[in-house]
Amino acid sequence: INVAAGGSLYADIPTQIGNTVTHRNNGEVNHSIYLVDPQNTYNSLIFPKNDTISSFNVNSWHHQGLNDLAKGVIVLARSNDMLPEAIVLDSNLHPFMIAVQFHPERLGENNGISITMRDNFFKAINKR
């Protein structure tokens, strides 16, 4: 999405930025991500509403990551190595675009992120 909108990628995270956070191994890896701005209204598209939580444990299974951001891409969450882990596209450019660098479908059906993303996706579909 970022590349299609004019941004760029790190082709290989361990080679290009190091491995202070393991994003990929021989299986699924868990690590923490934190909200860049806990007050950002876009957060509610991906993350469950809770004013006391600003970090989440997610799974990871990727070796590429966002580098230069395209115009209109807003980073909602990053990992400790500063890689974007959750983004949205400014709603002035697109009515609904959310993306994450983890697998919400593997977090469990009762996970707050999975539920929030699913519910907001269905709401966006129903608006069309």
Predicted regions and their residues:
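Amide-donor transfer/coupling interface in amidating biosynthetic enzymes
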Residues: 14-128
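Catalytic nucleophile loop
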Residues: 1-8, 103
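Acidic/charged, solvent-exposed loop-and-adjacent secondary-structure segments enriched in E/D, K/R, S/T
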Residues: 11
